[in-house]
Design a protein with these regions (language model features):
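A structural signal for short, well-ordered beta-strand segments
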Residues: 37, 86, 118-122
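Short beta-strand-to-loop capping motifs
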Residues: 88-93, 124-126
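Catalytic-core segments of nucleotide cyclases and related cyclic-nucleotide turnover enzymes
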Residues: 54, 99-110, 119, 125-157
Length: 157
């Protein structure tokens, strides 16, 4: 039981970064394609922590985790990899299915307390030329681009 706890994020009950690190090697050997990684970065959590307190920030992180649990697809792993960041690893989904799932997540995240939403990036793996690490890095880049777009939209309002 204690061993299992090593892989569980205490706040959200999702799997954690230890779980990711432990599984990356075997995921890289997986020959079922396509695969995808999705990175989700909750917007404004630091701001919530600073203005409303950590309890509210934690509540936001938990609420987002609950959305991910509620909408989880088969053959996927969901991890909280950082304070306000989540990673989803998917096996056997076409890109249009991944995009449609992300759209659903955007919609769900709009209903979180404080309505700050999230920035979501993804990357597809279609053969063994791309590693999980590469895919995660591409997902992070994609997410950062989305985050900049969100910031620009805010500035224009």
């Amino acid at each position: 039981k204690e061993d299992k706890m090593k892989y569980i994020d205490q706040l959200t009950s999702l799997k954690n970064r230890n779980y990711l690190n432990e599984n990356i090697a075997s995921w890289n050997k997986n020959t079922i394609y396509p695969q995808a990684t999705i990175i989700i970065d909750l917007n404004q959590v630091r701001n919530i922590n600073d203005t409303l307190g950590y309890e509210q920030g934690d509540a936001q992180i938990k609420a987002a985790a609950n959305v991910l649990i509620k909408t989880q697809l088969d053959n996927t792993d969901i991890m909280r990899t950082d304070g306000n960041e989540y990673l989803i690893y998917l096996v056997g989904y076409q890109e249009k299915q991944v995009v449609s799932y992300i759209r659903k997540l955007y919609k769900e995240f709009k209903n979180l307390p404080y309505e700050h939403g999230a920035a979501i990036g993804y990357s597809m793996i279609t053969n063994d030329m791309k590693t999980i690490e590469d895919s995660i890095n591409e997902s992070v880049e994609d997410m950062r681009t989305k985050k900049e777009e969100i910031e620009e939209e805010k500035d224009e309002k």
